[in-house]
Amino acid sequence: MEPGPCSRPAEPGHCVSGPAGAGSAFPESPLSVAGAEPGNRPGTVAAVLPAGGCGERMGVRTPKQFCRVLERPLISYTLQAMERVCWIKDIVVTVTGENMEAMRSIIQRYGHKRISLAEAGATRHRSIFNGLKALAEDQPDCKLTKPEVVIIHDAVRPFVEEDILLRVVLAAKEHGAAGAIRPLVSTVISPSADGHLDHSLDRAKHRASEMPQAFLFDVIYEAYQQCSDFDLEFGTECLQLALKYCHRKAKLVEGPPALWKVTYKQDLCAAEAMIKEKISQEICVVMNTKDEESVGHLLEEALRKELNCMKITSTVMDHIGGDIRNFIEQCYSFICVNVVSPDSQETRKLLRILEESSLPLLYPVVVVLVHCFDFTSVPLAQKMESLVWIRGLAKEVKERNILLSGLLLNYSQDEQKLQESLGQSAAIIAALVKERNSALVGQLLVA
């Protein structure tokens, strides 16, 4: 077993609670375990995440749990979701011996906490059993405390929420075993030996078994201890083991749509899209004047029209280092508006604060430098030449996961042309924020 570091920067979760910290993009969950009635408290809880799969169905050499999503291993997102739930005391991840060092590197690089490692077995059930042994007091090398309840969850289901974790844990405390379920999407059929339809299941009467699942530790550990070699080799359903060997009928808990499992290549694209959507929900507009009539405020209004579902806040450049730190706790997109001239000193100050926040360690941060001038007063080519420093700066900060680009806005005296330029600027910024395309880093775009 390998304990992970005990602290890390916070980051956006999916309606999960935990200590607030720099980089927390979403509000804490309304769940309050500390103030709950005794019967509604989870008790001592640990989690086991089997991560020894080889990704055969995905058809890639890299096991899917280590495939990168936005330049970060998929399993890191799952660990993030679990460790932000403060009442989960220990998280045991089972990985193959050949991937043990890679897993240690992930824990160290992304500052994951409360993580211990155990070696995976040859099958899913054997891996889970090894994870349970890491928590069992009857094992001579056990360094962890046996929990009252243990959660079993897939390393490739990164969008698990605290609400469903709490509900399955409380159900497990009452019934001994519990698991999340979802409605069947497709009808399940049984083929005959010669490849013809034998019978089909009534979709309305059946459900898909999902993760997370939770058990009284003594129940599931006893089930695995009694488990036959056949079940350990070919079984896949933990709830069935609790029923078969400990006679505990699991309580089935309806789960949210986000419980889906990353299984195929296209699922990685879907996961990336969901993560991008989560971290693109807020934009901070940094401008160099408080004047309500300034182009910065006009651009802010244009962004509100373009992105009517996003939260858009603003601050003044003079406040960088003060108010801006409050925005950093919630925001992954910054639009810096400079009407008069490029002010690289203030820009570098903002970038330095972002780097010190450790925010870019976990997610790509978008920074767009908007420079406003009347295209009729200064030749566009001349203006672009004066901004070549943006490319060098963008290349420098890209190494730290900050995606910086420039935008030239036509600050025309003609009201119609100005409104057109503001609309185009808002559309360009929206695309940069939503897509987070590293290929556009250092580019000077024109609206």
Curated annotation (Swiss-Prot):
Site keyed Positions substrate for the nucleophilic attack: positions: R203, K261
Site (Transition state stabilizer): R57, K64
InterPro entries to which the protein is assigned, alphabetical: IspD/TarI, ISPD_C, ISPD_synthase_CS, Nucleotide-diphossugar_trans
Cellular component aspect of the GO annotation: cytosol
Enzyme Commission number(s) of this protein: 2.7.7.40
Pathway this chain belongs to: Protein modification; protein glycosylation
Biological process according to GO: axon guidance; isoprenoid biosynthetic process; protein glycosylation; protein O-linked mannosylation
Cytoplasm found in the keyword field: yes
Compartment annotation: Cytoplasm, Cytosol
Main localization category: cytoplasm
UniProt GO MF annotations: cytidylyltransferase activity; D-ribitol-5-phosphate cytidylyltransferase activity; protein homodimerization activity
Keyword Cytoplasm: yes
Catalytic reaction list: D-ribitol 5-phosphate + CTP + H(+) = CDP-L-ribitol + diphosphate; D-ribose 5-phosphate + CTP + H(+) = CDP-D-ribose + diphosphate; D-ribulose 5-phosphate + CTP + H(+) = CDP-D-ribulose + diphosphate
Keywords: Cytoplasm, Nucleotidyltransferase, Transferase
Source domain of life: Eukaryota
SUPFAM superfamilies reported for this sequence: Nucleotide-diphospho-sugar transferases (SSF53448)
Quaternary context: Homodimer.
Family stated for the protein in its record: Belongs to the IspD/TarI cytidylyltransferase family. IspD subfamily.
Function in brief: Cytidylyltransferase required for protein O-linked mannosylation. Catalyzes the formation of CDP-ribitol nucleotide sugar from D-ribitol 5-phosphate. CDP-ribitol is a substrate of FKTN during the biosynthesis of the phosphorylated O-mannosyl trisaccharide (N-acetylgalactosamine-beta-3-N-acetylglucosamine-beta-4-(phosphate-6-)mannose), a carbohydrate structure present in alpha-dystroglycan (DAG1), which is required for binding laminin G-like domain-containing extracellular proteins with high affinity.
Annotated protein name in UniProt: D-ribitol-5-phosphate cytidylyltransferase
UniProt source species: Mus musculus
Gene giving rise to this polypeptide: Crppa
